[in-house]
From Swiss-Prot:
Compartments, record wording: Nucleus
A GO CC annotation given for this chain: nucleus
SMART domains assigned: KRAB, ZnF_C2H2
InterPro entries the UniProt entry points to: KRAB (IPR001909), KRAB_dom_sf (IPR036051), Znf_C2H2_sf (IPR036236), Znf_C2H2_type (IPR013087)
PANTHER family for the chain: ZINC FINGER PROTEIN, ZINC FINGER PROTEIN 680
UniProt record similarity statement: Belongs to the krueppel C2H2-type zinc-finger protein family.
Protein name, entry field: Zinc finger protein 100
Function according to Swiss-Prot or TrEMBL: May be involved in transcriptional regulation.
Disulfide bonds: none
Name of the gene encoding the protein in the UniProt record: ZNF100
Organism: Homo sapiens
Pfam families linked: KRAB, zf-C2H2
Highest taxon above the source species: Eukaryota
Length: 542
């Protein structure tokens, strides 16, 4: 029912109608008298409040706080904060004591709820209306309607004959409504009807604008406000608009840097209460979201959702360029850079650029020489956590990924993928400069340095530079005298794994290199080269 003083419903106006509608409301506001909080407020008795479920109570709190903020926004001045709002802000139950007493002794005048909030059917089904509806069956002799009203259902009811009316109201109030499936008892038509709808799971109330359905008219009415007040609240700093004043308030904290929600455990602050709630789980170690498939638990529902895709194989994020699909949006974003060739993350130390921030972070460690990830088994340290994880399998001997072609096992799927290229001969990484192709991207990156002459890995001790970090690591052992690669057969140690491999051949007698010219075998490629040179010298002298 539209408020006749303002020419439109108070709730719509208070929500901040777009453009001309808001201007018209402001004009009406000053011409026809101020709109008070009582005009847009709803109060409950304890009995009525307890009949609402938790979702309805939460919706009520949100709507009342929003109505008050809208009213302050409309008035443009500070208003005296109503007790109801103070109660809601403090998280207390907002039922009204005076109203509770009125319901205990049935009211002479029925409460008038704003139609735009509770809607037509909800108004008719309110607690007092239900009583009056029952009483209406016995005749309206004892009731006098307000001027201009057509029926009891439309208007406020005035007392004319106290005793008869009160007696009738007390009698009708004794009627209760019971739901057969759950034997739950209700004191109002509305709560009984709403409860029954939940058993049928029907959603009879449909939004004409977006076709979304609801089981309660109240929820539909609340939903409609999103369409009516679309982008009504605009941020003065960046121009971004929002449907809710509360959303704008939260957004403003990005500009102000305000973080009102502080963790009592560690002092870390957040700009949203939900972020604080999520953060607290770190301290408790709680992981309430568990995968039914494998039992793995997570502290965020979003993490569980992403994890489930491993089992289902769903990859909803597809690259429009090549058709490749991913189970995470972040993976798709990273993948797209392959097509663009963009490398936005640049190292300030050596100028090298990367397509991922995480790769740059890892790269920076090579300059610092820092190796924060240490193996508890042997003490070896790594500058990447993934390298440590991979290294640990050398102690366990675990190899999850097996090549179907040759039976060789690997502890990483990526290592198996690279290995398979040996059998297929695939070399997907091609140098644009000379056309040479490689089966690993890292080999192409190293190869490109031949053309550029770049040697980003420099020894702090002697200044010698290298184009591979592994070469620098091996070189540093010359200065430190470290020889980590030890022969189990004779105990001799070496500073390179390749040197140890060559040394082991002296014990096995293996000769891997054969010269096709004379059929002679050698245990080192260098010996083969020397023999080749000797052969040609002898040939030339003949």
């Amino acid at each position: 029912m539209d408020d006749p003083r303002y020419g439109m419903c108070p709730l719509k106006g208070a929500s901040g109608c777009p453009g001309a509608e808001r201007s018209l409301l402001v004009q009406s506001y000053f011409e026809k008298g101020p709109l008070t909080f009582r005009d847009v407020a709803i109060e409950f008795s304890l009995e009525e409040w307890q009949c609402l479920d938790s979702a309805q109570q939460g919706l009520y709190r949100k709507v009342m706080l929003e109505n008050y903020r809208n009213l302050v926004f409309l008035a443009g001045i500070a208003l005296t904060k109503p007790d109801l709002i103070t109660c809601l802000e403090q998280g207390k139950e907002p039922w009204n004591i005076k109203r509770h007493e009125m319901v205990a002794k049935p009211p002479v005048i029925c409460s008038h709820f704003p139609q735009d909030l509770w809607a037509e059917q909800d108004i008719k089904d309110s607690f007092q209306e239900a009583i009056l509806k029952k009483y209406g069956k016995y005749g309206h002799d004892n009731l006098q309607l307000q001027k201009g009203c057509k029926s009891v259902d439309e208007c406020k009811v005035h007392k004319e004959h106290d005793n008869k009316l009160n007696q009738c109201l007390i009698t009708t109030q004794s009627n209760i409504f019971q739901c057969d499936p759950s034997a739950k008892v209700f004191h109002t038509f509305s709560n009984s009807n709403r409860h029954k709808i939940r058993h049928t799971r029907k959603k009879p109330f449909k939004c004409k604008k977006c076709e979304k359905s609801f089981c309660m008219l109240l929820h539909l009415t609340q939903h409609k406000r999103f369409h009516i007040t679309e982008n009504s609240y605009q941020c003065k700093d960046c121009g971004k608009a929002f449907n809710w004043f509360s959303t704008l308030t939260t957004h403003r904290r990005i500009h102000t840097g305000e973080k009102p929600y502080k963790c009592e455990e560690c002092g870390k602050a957040f700009n949203r209460s939900s972020h604080l709630t999520t953060h607290k789980i770190i301290h408790t170690g709680e992981k309430p979201y568990r995968c039914e498939e494998c039992g793995k638990a997570f502290n965020r529902s979003s993490h569980l959702t992403t994890h489930k895709r491993i089992h289902t194989g769903v990859k909803p994020y597809k690259c429009t360029e090549c058709g490749k699909a991913f189970n995470r949006s972040s993976h798709l974003t990273t993948h797209r850079i392959i097509h663009t060739g963009e490398k936005p993350y640049k190292c300030e130390e050596c100028g090298k650029a990367f397509n991922q921030s995480s790769t740059l972070t890892t790269h920076k460690i090579t300059h610092a020489g820092e190796k924060p990830y240490k193996c508890e088994e042997c003490g070896k340290a790594f500058y990447r956590f993934s390298y440590l994880t991979k290294h640990k399998t050398s102690h366990t001997g675990e190899k999850f990924y097996k090549c179907e072609e040759c039976g060789k096992g690997f502890n990483w799927s990526s290592a198996l993928t690279k290995h398979k290229r040996i059998h297929t001969g695939e070399k997907p990484y091609k140098c644009e400069e000379c056309g040479k192709a490689f089966n690993e991207s890292s080999n192409l990156t190293t190869h490109k340095m031949i053309h550029t002459g770049e040697k980003p890995y420099k020894c702090d001790e002697c200044g010698k530079a290298f184009n591979r970090s592994s070469q620098l690591t091996a070189h540093k052992m010359i200065h430190t005298g470290e020889k980590p690669y030890k022969c189990e057969e004779c105990g001799k140690a070496f500073n390179r794994s390749s040197t140890l491999t060559k040394h082991k051949i002296t014990h096995t007698g293996e000769k891997s290199y054969k010269w096709e010219e004379c059929g002679k075998d050698f245990n080192q490629s260098l010996s083969l080269i020397k023999q080749n040179n000797s052969y040609w010298r002898e040939t030339l002298q003949m």
